[in-house]
Amino acid sequence: MRTLTAYNEDNFRQIEQYNGISVVRFSAPWCPPCQASEEMFSQFADRLDRDIQVGKVNVDQAPVLTTKYEIWGLPSVLIFHEGQLVKR
């Protein structure tokens, strides 16, 4: 099973500077839909090409990112290409 990198304000620059595709899931431990879909996201991540960065953000630990990317519903999956948000 693929390990999902936990991102926060300190290391999210890795996503913003990556020259490929990144898929990032924003969620929270208190969110029932987040918990219910966590395994499905892990299985999805396992099927992606290894050149695609995959990670997760706990919104409670990353309020600046949550605001910056306008995360209003959980879970939210954002797709970045060369550091730019292209799809949510």
Where are these regions (language model features)?
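Thiol/disulfide oxidoreductase modules built on the thioredoxin-like
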Residues: 66-74, 84-88
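Conserved SAM-binding loop
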Residues: 23, 33, 54
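Residue-level detector of structured alpha->beta connecting loops
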Residues: 19-20, 49, 70
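Short pre-active-site segment immediately N-terminal to redox-active cysteine/selenocysteine motifs
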Residues: 20, 27-30, 73
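Nucleotide phosphate-binding site architecture
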Residues: 13, 32, 42, 86
